[in-house]
């Protein structure tokens, strides 16, 4: 399966799950009169996602049911954007990369992480050579500075 096919399937799943959650949340926030955890839960459709029920229970337990409409509005805004935040990659090199190098790196990263990946490039001469690529919480460090530091540690320890 290609990355683009996986993206299409993931988008369909995302739309389905968020659509059901939004519909259930809108139903819950449309009740009139006193807002209680019990009334909100009773207003939900039987097939409402478990996460929606858990959200209402958590807000009720903390006395924050009045904040549910704001949470729904924020969630709706996120789903319109297609998720929480687009994934961003930061590529740091020891020297300025050519447009062709940037394009090749961007293509390779998008093939692995999806077409919506935003890639930024920066220069840090202290790397001496190589690259450091950060995407989300993942870091790939092929810099000469890191390799030399590892050699130095190995020499010091034995």
Swiss-Prot record:
- Report if keyword Signal is assigned: no
One GO CC term of this entry?
plasma membrane
Under the heading Pfam families, the entry gives: OSCP
Record membrane topology:
Peripheral membrane protein
Subcellular location per the Swiss-Prot or TrEMBL entry: Cell membrane
Extract the GO molecular function terms from the UniProt entry. proton-transporting ATP synthase activity, rotational mechanism
Q: Which UniProt keywords apply?
A: ATP synthesis, Cell membrane, CF(1), Hydrogen ion transport, Ion transport, Membrane, Transport
Family membership noted in the UniProt record: Belongs to the ATPase delta chain family.
PANTHER family given in the database record:
ATP SYNTHASE DELTA CHAIN
As for what it does, the entry says: F(1)F(0) ATP synthase produces ATP from ADP in the presence of a proton or sodium gradient. F-type ATPases consist of two structural domains, F(1) containing the extramembraneous catalytic core and F(0) containing the membrane proton channel, linked together by a central stalk and a peripheral stalk. During catalysis, ATP synthesis in the catalytic domain of F(1) is coupled via a rotary mechanism of the central stalk subunits to proton translocation. This protein is part of the stalk that links CF(0) to CF(1). It either transmits conformational changes from CF(0) to CF(1) or is implicated in proton conduction.
The subunit structure is:
F-type ATPases have 2 components, F(1) - the catalytic core - and F(0) - the membrane proton channel. F(1) has five subunits: alpha(3), beta(3), gamma(1), delta(1), epsilon(1). F(0) has three main subunits: a(1), b(2) and c(10-14). The alpha and beta chains form an alternating ring which encloses part of the gamma chain. F(1) is attached to F(0) by a central stalk formed by the gamma and epsilon chains, while a peripheral stalk is formed by the delta and b chains.
Q: What is this protein called?
A: ATP synthase subunit delta
Say which species the protein is native to. Roseiflexus castenholzii (strain DSM 13941 / HLO8)
């Amino acid at each position: 399966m290609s990355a683009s096919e996986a993206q299409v399937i993931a988008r369909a799943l995302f739309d389905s799950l968020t659509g059901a959650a939004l519909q259930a949340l809108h139903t819950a926030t449309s009740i009139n009169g006193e807002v209680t955890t019990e009334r909100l839960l009773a207003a939900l459709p039987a097939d409402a996602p478990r996460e929606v029920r858990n959200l209402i229970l958590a807000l009720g337990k903390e006395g924050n049911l009045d904040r549910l409409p704001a949470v729904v509005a924020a969630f709706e805004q996120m789903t319109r954007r297609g998720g929480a935040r687009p994934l961003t990659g930061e590529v740091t090199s020891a020297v300025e990369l050519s447009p062709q190098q940037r394009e090749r790196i961007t293509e390779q990263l998008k093939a692995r992480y999806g077409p919506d990946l935003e890639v930024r490039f920066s220069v840090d001469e202290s790397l001496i050579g190589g690259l450091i690529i950060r995407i989300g919480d993942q870091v790939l460090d092929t810099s000469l500075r890191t390799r030399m530091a590892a050699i130095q540690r190995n020499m010091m320890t034995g």
